[in-house]
């Protein structure tokens, strides 16, 4: 937090180093007018307002950052003798609020689609317009949309918990090979249905991790690799280790990701092929969950892809957890 004390003539009487840093000043401006820090009209108006005896608050744009200014007049014998100006960098806070609003809007939109379908099918059935032989088909559609809805709710809960970072995590030795094997076991029916072959290459290895987070990360990467693959394609997991690090690489033979989309695939609800997103399924939160889970495990994730030639996602983790 930056702190500046000025007199009634706008001269700087005192300021801390944080204040100079927030204004990107390479010198101390004590004894000069506070206007030397920022000559924008908004800042000038705030200073004039506080020196007229009014409490003032606003957010300034300084060098690409959002800085909250809180100014209080110093009053003696009913006269304003100066002011105390507090400066707080709120860039991260405002970004989080913006992301939260965007997330809420996206969740509402994503929930509306399956709910509208379920409501529509149920209304047609209730009206008696459906032939008896068509009822299983309509019921199947309702079931499919309800499963999509459940998956979305589960993913939203998962990513909200990761965002809050309040969940007490239990770190323990985890068999990485077994985690990958379990993910393939859970996905084998989907892979079989889409005619995608699954392979694990590596050896038994352990790392200190939060088991549920590692399982979420591996499962979601493998799930995406299967969904966006081609007929008779494959998904291969390669496990390697060094003295300090575990590396999990998931490589597929799928459609690949265009270069212009590669920086955005870890964003919430971002889908590369929006026209086929409903057909392929999923909530658009899978890779966002991966990013959060890997980050919580103090790891890193790297994506390499070429449109038409598959995708490779590399997750690196430290073997030993350090507080």
Q: What are these model-predicted stretches?
A:
Residues 144-149:
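Short alpha-helical segment of the dimerization/phosphotransfer core of two-component systems
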Residues 190-200, 204-205:
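Short conserved segments within the C-terminal catalytic ATPase subdomain
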Residues 298-299:
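Conserved glycine-rich
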Residues 164-169, 202, 206-209:
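Conserved micro-motifs of the catalytic ATP-binding
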Residues 30-92:
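PAS-family sensory/regulatory modules and their coupling/dimerization elements
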Residues 126-133:
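Short acidic helix/loop segment immediately C-terminal to the autophosphorylated histidine
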Residues 257-271, 291:
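Short conserved segment of the HATPase_c
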């Amino acid at each position: 937090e930056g702190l500046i004390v000025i007199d009634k003539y706008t001269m700087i009487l005192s300021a801390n180093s944080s204040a100079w840093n927030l204004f990107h000043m390479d010198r101390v401006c004590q004894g000069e007018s506070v206007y030397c820090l920022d000559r924008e009209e908004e800042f000038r108006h705030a200073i004039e307002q506080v020196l007229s005896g009014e409490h003032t608050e606003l957010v300034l744009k300084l060098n690409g950052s959002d800085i909250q200014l809180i100014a209080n007049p110093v009053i003696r014998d009913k006269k304003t003798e100066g002011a105390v100006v507090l400066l707080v960098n709120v860039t991260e806070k405002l970004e989080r609020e913006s992301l939260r609003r965007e997330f809420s809007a996206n969740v509402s939109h994503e929930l509306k689609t399956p709910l509208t379908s379920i409501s529509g099918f149920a209304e047609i059935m209730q009206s008696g317009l459906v032939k008896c032989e068509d009822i299983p088909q309509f019921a199947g559609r309702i079931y499919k949309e309800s499963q999509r809805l459940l998956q979305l709710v589960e993913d939203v809960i998962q990513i909200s918990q990761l965002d809050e970072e309040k969940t007490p995590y239990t770190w323990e030795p985890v068999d990485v090979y077994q985690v990958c094997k379990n993910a393939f076991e859970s996905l084998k029916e989907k892979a079989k249905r889409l005619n995608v072959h699954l392979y694990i290459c590596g050896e038994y290895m352990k790392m200190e991790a939060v088991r549920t987070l590692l399982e979420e990360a591996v499962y979601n990467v493998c799930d995406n690799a299967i969904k966006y693959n081609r007929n008779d394609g494959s998904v291969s997991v390669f496990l390697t280790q060094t003295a300090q690090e575990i590396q999990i690489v998931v490589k597929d033979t799928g459609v690949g990701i265009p270069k212009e989309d590669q920086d955005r695939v870890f964003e919430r609800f971002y889908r590369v092929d929006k026209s086929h997103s409903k057909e392929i399924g999923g909530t658009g939160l899978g890779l966002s969950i991966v990013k959060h889970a890997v980050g919580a495990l103090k790891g890193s994730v790297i994506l390499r892809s070429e449109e038409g030639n598959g995708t490779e996602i590399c997750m690196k983790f430290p073997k030993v957890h350090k507080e």
